[in-house]
Amino acid sequence: MNPKKLSITLSVLLACAFCAGLIFNASAQKQSKHPYASDKPMPEPALFGEGVISTAEDDLNAAFTPDGQTIYFTRNFPASKLGVIVVSHFRNGKWQPPEIASFSGQFTDYDPFVSPDGSRLFYCSNRSEEGKVKNDFDIWFVEKTEGGWSQPKSIGAPINTKSNEFYPSVAADGTLYFSSNRQGGKGGFDIYRSKLVGGKYGEPENLGDGVNTASGELDNYISPDQRFLVFAAYNRPDDLGGGSGDLYISQQQNGAWTPSKNLGPKINSPVREYCPIGSPDGKYFFFTSYRGNLDKPLEKPFKNYQELHASLTGVLNGRGNVYQVDLSALGVQ
């Protein structure tokens, strides 16, 4: 072959290979992108998973596996006092209809949380170790196995007591944060943490005045590095929800928690906000809200029964829905 032609041919082949590499890398990046990721900034809360995750039912919590491809949440049935943890998988470009999680469906279960490494899923339940219904809620967990989740196990003492324990949230080092109305608190529910040492949880410690008050604090989310804590508080003077619950944030500085701040009208509304959690990639913040079409006085009457029925049975009917917003909206420094 003519040396000149050979040189041109090699140049073309190299260029094609380079372009193919770019296309492959772009495709790989696109495929590895978490399904909840947005191509545009999300400075304002937006409804998440409408019709599948957020529905006309009372939907709360949003616990993702580390790869973001699976979400566990609670479908709540207040009238029957039943809460069921369900799971949805992201397949074929969309969230699939939820199924009952393998460890739920018989007792009242809430507040799923997947550990940062994906090895455990924590939740709270009114089940007892004897397989009967209790009068209080305890923290339970399941462990990841080759065949799925293990059988549920009680986290036991000193975490669980005869009082209620709710909303487990686990940091990267295994430290467990939770809420409880046990004796010795500041009033109502307080938020506690228990350090994992040698595979065992130590005596829980109350997070103190920066976080807890006599009003009641629960539904806590701890960042993996324990730099900040987001939680729900009730009946505080600055509660935008009239006492029904707002989300607050406190940051850990030099081992102490800063006085908590209301996240303001960008996150909170005139109704209830709770169940905070961060996404596995640390870019987004999810929470549950009861905001909807019926949380303020109507400007005009319904035209007919069909319009009333559509409003009462629609996604924004005032029951719980999951919302997503950029984590930067929290103002964490």
Q: What is each model feature region?
A:
Residues M1-Q31:
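Bacterial Sec-dependent N-terminal signal peptides
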Residues Q29-Q333:
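Short, conserved micro-motifs composed of acidic
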